Amino acid sequence: MLFRSVEVHDAEGLAAGMVSIAIGACWIGESMAHRRPQAGNVLLVELVEALRHGGFVLFDVQLSNPHLARFGCLEIDEAAYGRTLAQAVCRPASLRLQEGHLSSEAWMPQ
């Protein structure tokens, strides 16, 4: 089990961040905050892409909402969650985020 912090920075410092727990191929988002408009969205899009490429099979956001549904979030029933979680924690996965992957122009309001 690893506790992870994923962050988006701009010229003024931290723009958005998420504290998470990684267990095998399961990623559990615990807390997310943003200081700049849309920075949290950039974090989610980049993180989901990195999780997919790293072999993660479950990203538990804890609570679905219409905003997260725009990014592909879907609810699954308790039985499906249990099966997916049991498989995910036994699988290896890795997260490789590239520093400086996006320029601030990609998300800063114009």
Give the residues covered by each predicted segment.
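Aromatic (often tryptophan-rich) hydrophobic motifs at membrane interfaces
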Residues: 7-9, 14-76
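Terminal substrate-recognition subdomain of acyl/acetyltransferases
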Residues: 58-110
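Short, small-residue-biased leader/transition segments that mark boundaries at the very start
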Residues: 1-2
